[in-house]
Amino acid sequence: MKLQNKTIIITGGSKGLGVSMAEECAREGARVVITARSLGELQTVADKIRAAGGRVEPMQADMARPEELEALITKTLEVFGSIDGLINNAGINYVKPFLEIDPREWQRVLDVDLNGAFRLTQLCARQMHRAGHGGSIVQIASVHTHASLAGAAPYDAAKCGVVGFSKAAAVELAAYGIRVNILSPGLCETEIWKDIVAAAPSEKECLDYWKANIPGQRLITPLEVAKCCVFLLSNDSSCITGANIFADLGMTSLLISREPYASKNINASEA
């Protein structure tokens, strides 16, 4: 097992990608701490993991409240005795035209997605440094750190900020055996996809559009993202730090979607 007896904290662990991350880390032998703003859904996830033989502890924590993040660290050490890894997965977003963004909405996104991620990264890194055994931190960012969509300014600002401080942290913490990497997923089969489909004329039309913009011609799955996280948390990636890895089936490498007039139909002449 790749994460045997390692204690891994996973934020946003009550739904979507966080659930798959928690399940996969537990399958790989980790002692998992899952967090979210409320305990209700966390408990359901924890019950499922325990039923499969995994070790997990649900803990309430709001990423925008520094005192709750400090309490999370304290309780994790009380329950499991160490912190070996962190997946900063929690995040929120308000989709709104740039000219209509409310400063309070802007601040709320940054408080959770950027400031909360920074605080928890720092708290975990301090504990890893004190313990002297190193560790691995994985920040869940987005393809939005490479390119944008209309209405995503607060989210984009936060995720690009996460990439920035994580690279700086990776440089400083490498000497202590602490690795910091960023995983930027593309379009994934989660609740967000359901929201996208709900706003489209039809599911088929929506899927056809996105397939045309993804070289792999499908959505990525939560399990695929979770397996990437396990790799980055494990010793298999011991030489990787400061990287922003795009798990997007080639989405960010595509210049323009497939069209009848795309480059494959153009015969270049010699200059």
Regions found by a protein language model. Give the residues of each.
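Conserved glycine-rich cofactor-binding loop
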Residues: 12-16
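Substrate-binding pocket helix/loop in short-chain dehydrogenase/reductase
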Residues: 97-98, 102-110, 210
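Active-site helix of classical SDR
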Residues: 121, 158, 166
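Alpha-helical segment proximal to the catalytic Tyr-Lys
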Residues: 126, 171-175, 238
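Residue(s) in the substrate-gating loop at a strand-loop-helix junction
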Residues: 142
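C-terminal substrate-recognition "lid" of short-chain dehydrogenase/reductases
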Residues: 218-247
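Short C-terminal tail/terminal secondary-structure segment
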Residues: 230, 241-271
